[in-house]
Amino acid sequence: MALETKPAQDPATEIKHELDPKRKAALDTALAQVEKSFGKGSAMRLGDQPVQNVEVIPTGSLALDMALGIGGLPKGRIVEIYGPESSGKTTLALHVVANAQKKGGVAAYIDAEHALDPAYARKLGVDTDSLIVSQPDNGEQALEIADMLIRSGALDVIVIDSVAALVPKAEIEGEMGDSHVGLQARLMSQALRKMTGALAQAGTTAIFINQLREKIGVFFGNPETTTGGKALKFYASVRLDIRRIQTLKNGDEAVGNRTRVKVVKNKMAPPFKSAEFDMLYGEGISREGSVIDMAQQVGVVKKSGSWFTYEGDQLGQGREKVRQFLKDNPAITEEIENKVKAEFGLIGSADQFAEDEDAAAAAAVSEAAAADAAKDTKATAAPAAKSSRAKA
């Protein structure tokens, strides 16, 4: 006798159980008291608010945006970028700043290392005239300034460069050789406890750049660790491990690095994905190079021999020539980029965009027609009113 098996029910379509009326009344009373004491929205049912997608800031690399799973770095969260020296940590952070500014956002840069190069930042697209920069004297001052700027609610992104340079005041005022065990870790733990809630309320992304150190006496496993204690590892929603894997050369001249970023931690999407992209000297992340790589991966751009084709048209021979072609034709670059994002499900398809545009155009036409009709009604009503007053 065969056993009957019922198909598994989708959790989203499960029947909602009705709450006992007495318990429901008690819960509603408690929620009303919470709102009265702490303000509207302090506690609510998750279903009371419409589900909203997480706002993101693009990183400048399409490959990294796809690896993050949501199209960029999440707003209102803490992000840690760490890696060896000269691996591109600051460059990546500056690209995020530039992209936030391009969207009309406000950015701040806490330069604890006192090493920010405004000329290089401008080459990466940063609007240095509107960038808020602070070069604090000690770690407490740096984190206090960061906290005050975040609580203003006006920032979109703030970069702290770097955690290793957040030296506690006691260490600066003390003598060389004095022991200050755990002082920086306690400072970071206290600051992150204060910042986390403020970042979420303000919708500000905080990027902490960190350095690597080696643990002494570790014979098995990875001896590398980051500075500033363990608090940042817990509070960060995204942790990025950035490494230089290859030197890019034009003949004998080095023109940049091939960079790999591993998403070590990700609370927004599945972690442990990697992205590779070109980082060119004096130019930063090659957006066009990343678009070529990802478009080729999903089949939007095809490669035959050394020739690259897009929708049957040849883009050029050799990756460097295609990169230059896309740089000279930003409209084509954006079109290819949108198709790649659609393949990954981050945005609607091109057909959906066309439908949305048609709907928006139709709505605009109907609004204009309604406005014209209202004007005509007013125009005909005015003489009638005048004549009625004259008769009276």
UniProtKB/Swiss-Prot annotation:
Residues 379-392 have a biased composition (Low complexity). Pfam families: RecA, RecA_C. Can catalyze the hydrolysis of ATP in the presence of single-stranded DNA, the ATP-dependent uptake of single-stranded DNA by duplex DNA, and the ATP-dependent hybridization of homologous single-stranded DNAs. It interacts with LexA causing its activation and leading to its autocatalytic cleavage. GO terms for cellular component: cytosol. CDD domains: RecA. Belongs to the RecA family. ATP binds at residues 83-90. It comes from Bifidobacterium breve. One of its GO terms (biological process) is SOS response. It is found in: Cytoplasm. SUPFAM superfamilies: P-loop containing nucleoside triphosphate hydrolases (SSF52540), RecA protein, C-terminal domain (SSF54752). PANTHER family: MITOCHONDRIAL DNA REPAIR PROTEIN RECA HOMOLOG-RELATED, RECA. Residues 1-21, 372-392 are annotated as: Disordered. One of its GO terms (molecular function) is single-stranded DNA binding. This is Protein RecA. Disulfide bonds: none annotated. Keywords: ATP-binding, Cytoplasm, DNA damage, DNA recombination, DNA repair, DNA-binding, Nucleotide-binding, SOS response. The gene is recA. InterPro entries: AAA+_ATPase (IPR003593), DNA_recomb/repair_RecA (IPR013765), DNA_recomb/repair_RecA_CS (IPR020584), P-loop_NTPase (IPR027417), RecA-like_C (IPR049261), RecA-like_N (IPR049428), RecA_ATP-bd (IPR020588), RecA_C_sf (IPR023400).
